[in-house]
Amino acid sequence: MEEINKTPKQIVAALDNYVIGQNQAKKAVAIALRNRYRRMELSAEMQEEITPKNMLMIGPTGVGKTEIARRLAKIVHAPFVKVEATKFTEVGYVGRDVESMVRDLVDVAIEMEKQQAYSGVRAQAVQAADKRLVKLLVPAQKKQAKNNGNEFQNMMNMFSQMQNGQTPNVDDSSNEEVTDEVRNQRLSVADQLKTGRLENSEVTIEMDDPQQAAAGNNNMLGQMGIDLGDSLGALMPKKRIQRTMPVSEAREILVREESEKLVNNADIYHDAIVRAENTGIIFIDEIDKITKGGQQGSGEVSREGVQRDILPIVEGSQISTKYGPINTDHILFIASGAFAESKPSDLIAELQGRFPIRVELDDLSKDDFVKILTEPKNALIKQYIALIGTDNIKVTFTIEAIEAIATIAYKVNHETQNIGARRLHTILEKLLEELLYEGPDMEMGEVTITESYVNERIGNIAQDKDLSRYIL
């Protein structure tokens, strides 16, 4: 609740650190976020009646549509998913169905809840992980296995833990034969771990196979809300692999495993669904490409059919996920598109009505390019200065050089294809190509990028329309 309790002015001020201009769009999203907080302050009966006012952002590529939505979600710690409308297919065709965007949102919310829960038990998890590291670094001899009748009980305990989505708690300390020598060595290693003297030492650990987890997440049943891995996980234990890595890296893997044992997954799943329902943001990009005015080949799947499939989700419906049903009534949907070859009215009327707030983003001017290069927290020029700085070269840009870069970006955008701020990436890569290549072998410690330096390297390319079309 505290996270979304920000005034519209505070939200806009936070967005100003990352996105230049586009004040109208910033105001619109800030109001939408504040309305979420206002809704939560009302009675339960009134909360059900108030739905978010979904938004349609209209503007060319590279002007900040996606960045505004992405930064907005980070500011209020909301689950955020970006999808492309063109990736979906109409029900009945092979491909991703539109409901998968909601399931992706739930996955993001669950990871956020897990991180929050894990941070609460981290101190305990680190202690347990360090104990495991000590045993791995100083292994003891295994006792002779005895058939004492407890193996069946241990197997049933593991079965129960896996059914509840928990990592089986396998404690093999009772199977170790710890001599006085091993005990003393372990005490010494434990002390060295605490003081950080073994962080770069190599250790071999057993961990879940990440490839198996990735394969389980990509199956078609998962897209329908059925997790085959979860269903069979209790019968087929996770595949474990051995890897050798530094202690610092191994500790983080073991801390996560120990954290999983200390938290209640059922609570995490419930809280994640509530979070996704009330604070989730789904950004649907390229929605203009599924309109009647968009380019369509005769063999393409009906784009209007995709619109009709999106409609019930945006209107509010219940979607089945492997963690339980989720209601989309209060999820905020932000759609965006350039609408260069179509217009918003080409969307089906029902879908238009579900995006009542429309914001047109401005094209970027030369002054905007100058600000983009210098003002944001992690401005492009700051990024390149930091990158080249790793080669012990101090790079500085004169004001005239920055203005020359901005002028070239503006000119090339308007003479070829307008790709907005993304043009700056292309120009800076070409401009600094020699420094990035020669940097590690250069002896000079300082380089100043001047206007003449800019004109010498990319001025001629910018003047030639054919060259700039292919190079910049």
Swiss-Prot record:
Any one GO biological process: proteolysis involved in protein catabolic process
Keywords: ATP-binding, Chaperone, Cytoplasm, Nucleotide-binding
Classification via SMART domains: AAA, ClpB_D2-small
GO cellular component terms, semicolon-separated: HslUV protease complex
Keyword ATP-binding: yes
Compartment(s): Cytoplasm
Annotated Pfam families: AAA, AAA_2
SUPFAM superfamilies: P-loop containing nucleoside triphosphate hydrolases (SSF52540)
Predominant location category: cytoplasm
Keyword Nucleotide-binding on entry: yes
GO molecular function: ATP binding; ATP hydrolysis activity; peptidase activity; proteasome-activating activity
UniProt xrefs under PANTHER family: ATP-DEPENDENT CLP PROTEASE ATP-BINDING SUBUNIT CLPX-LIKE, MITOCHONDRIAL-RELATED (PTHR48102), ATP-DEPENDENT PROTEASE ATPASE SUBUNIT HSLU (PTHR48102:SF3)
Entry-linked NCBIfam families: hslU, PRK05201.1
Similarity section: Belongs to the ClpX chaperone family. HslU subfamily.
UniProt protein name: ATP-dependent protease ATPase subunit HslU
The species this protein was found in: Lactiplantibacillus plantarum (strain ATCC BAA-793 / NCIMB 8826 / WCFS1) (Lactobacillus plantarum)
